[in-house]
């Protein structure tokens, strides 16, 4: 045991020297690459689900949009504990306080799994009225129930996977997180068509495949964290106190708000699209998945920056924090410009991949074109939110997280359709992105001034 402890101590010291001493730009690129790959593969398997289910019918495609709200809640809880504990953990590692970092790791993991168990229990007991409340039409609701049932059973593993990926990343070990997520996603590429078409399980088979793959990812991530993390995952270190829980809650609140607001906004989009029929719900569900893929690249870049930010902020190296922030903002904006052009040009073909119904395509293409005009602002918006979260500016980070998906989008998507019909649903996200950009500017000016 003494030898193992010594090895981990040496590993922690080496990681500290890497995070606080290596050139910032290459370091961020090295750390963000596994995160970007993880996000892209996860998005690809979400889109694969959308594609396969789209072959079953328009109502089944709409069910994916309903289920997305529940999945976002699971993500929110996983990110709350994973990012909440991870933010504080990276700062403690920057201060070389490894014992407290180990306790944060254990508390974050245990909290995520327990929250998933709560979601599973509540969801399974109230599933039918829940999907109706989330915007299902009478034709979509049965398929949403079928898809969500196995996913809710696996909710503890889903929440645990999201948390563990973040906890590994904040230790600077994003490659191991990538291995866990990519393994489950690749398995889904095989199981989804097998269950849906070969075993004739339909949309239930798609949900079952996703549940199995999330469980596999959880198992791999748990093993990786125990064997290869800078801090060993051990529930014996799960000794929460008031101050520790306050740190986790403060660090995770922006993630919870960001993902929770995302779930609310998806529900509001479904409710707003409901009067325009199944095609409108299905079209918006497809666009949300496509734009999630585009934004996942930028989220991956920010995830590479966060451990660098946490370590260096904890070590008092503020110039490195600022250098990393501006590098990520510029790179994210350039990437989004390229993606926006590609998505605009190939919008019809992209939507038709998932559903060839002309009504679905019309809604999807219009929404995709509008969102391409403003998606380039998300690099600045996301990097500001992720940096303030890592720096423990909980109030600012929580407010900025709430703006894009909650404070602005939720009311906008319910009001604009009253004036513009289905066009109001299609343009709501873009209006929200512009308002969020304008609000973020003064906050980031102040934060960057304080880092001088």
Predicted regions and their residues:
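Transmembrane alpha-helical segments of integral membrane proteins
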Residues: 382, 408-417
């Amino acid at each position: 045991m003494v030898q193992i402890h010594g090895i981990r101590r040496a590993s922690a010291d080496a990681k500290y020297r890497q995070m606080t001493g290596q050139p910032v730009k290459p370091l961020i690129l090295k750390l963000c690459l596994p995160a970007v790959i993880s996000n892209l593969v996860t998005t690809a398997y979400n889109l694969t689900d959308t594609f396969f289910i789209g072959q079953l019918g328009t109502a089944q495609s709409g069910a994916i949009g309903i289920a997305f709200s529940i999945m976002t809640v699971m993500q929110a809880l996983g990110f709350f504990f994973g990012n909440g504990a991870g933010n504080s953990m990276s700062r403690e590692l920057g201060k070389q306080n490894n014992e407290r970092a180990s306790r944060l790791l254990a508390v974050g993991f245990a909290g995520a799994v327990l929250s998933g168990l709560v979601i599973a229990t509540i969801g399974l007991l109230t599933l039918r009225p829940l999907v109706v409340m989330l915007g299902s039409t009478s034709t979509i609701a049965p398929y949403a129930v079928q898809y969500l049932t196995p996913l809710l059973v696996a909710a503890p593993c889903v929440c645990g996977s999201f948390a563990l990926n973040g906890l590994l990343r904040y230790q600077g070990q994003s490659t191991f997180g990538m291995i866990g997520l990519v393994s489950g996603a690749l398995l889904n590429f095989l199981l989804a068509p097998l269950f849906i078409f070969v075993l004739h399980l339909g949309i239930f088979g798609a949900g079952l495949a996703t549940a199995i793959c999330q469980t596999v990812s959880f198992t791999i991530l748990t093993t990786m964290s125990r064997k290869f993390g800078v801090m060993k995952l051990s529930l014996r270190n799960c000794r929460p106190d008031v101050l520790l829980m306050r740190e986790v809650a403060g660090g995770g609140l922006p993630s919870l708000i960001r993902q929770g607001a995302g779930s609310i906004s998806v529900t509001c989009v479904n409710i707003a699209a409901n009067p325009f029929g199944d095609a409108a719900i299905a079209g918006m569900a497809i666009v949300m998945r496509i734009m999630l893929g585009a934004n996942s690249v930028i989220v991956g870049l920010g995830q590479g920056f966060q451990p660098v930010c946490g370590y260096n902020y904890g070590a008092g190296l503020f110039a490195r924090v600022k250098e990393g922030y501006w590098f990520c903002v510029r790179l994210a904006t350039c990437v989004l410009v390229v993606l926006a052009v590609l998505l605009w040009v190939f919008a019809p073909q992209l939507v038709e991949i998932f559903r060839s119904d002309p009504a679905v395509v019309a809604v999807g293409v219009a929404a995709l074109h509008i969102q391409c005009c403003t998606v380039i602002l998300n690099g600045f918006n996301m990097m500001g939110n992720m940096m303030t979260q890592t720096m423990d500016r909980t109030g600012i980070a929580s407010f900025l997280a709430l703006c894009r998906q909650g404070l602005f989008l939720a009311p906008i998507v319910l009001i604009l359709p009253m004036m513009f019909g289905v066009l109001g649903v299609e343009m709501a996200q873009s209006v929200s992105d512009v308002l969020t950009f304008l609000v973020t500017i003064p906050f980031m000016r102040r934060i960057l001034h304080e880092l001088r």
